Amino acid sequence: MAPLQQVWGDDYNKALCGAKVALCFMSKLNKDTYTRRCFEIPATNTVLISEYSDELSSLYNAGVEADFFKSKQDLIQILHRYVDDEAYRESVAKAGHKRVVVDGHDVVSRMKMVLEWFNEIKNKDLK
């Protein structure tokens, strides 16, 4: 196993783009049910493997667009499947990326939404 280190900015993007799979852990302190990483990872055509939450499992089809684990044993089994089966891994990565774009979780779609909200507020204030 390669040495682990934290990465930020461009290095974070390069790390995700170069990974076969990427793990996502939720903050217990914040009681996360999903995080921005749940969109960033598939946006880079990398398979998202995350702790299970009801909310997150409603955003992606498990085993088709992303994958979720509830225990250490689940995680190990899931990792073996993705590392051992390149065609399956690539299929899930591609489907996950498509889900992010189709559902509007990409940066461009989010920015359009923010600008629409801004214009709605601005137009209300002008009336």
Whereabouts are the PLM-identified features?
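Catalytic binding pocket for nucleotide-activated donors in carbohydrate/polymer assembly enzymes
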Residues: 1-127
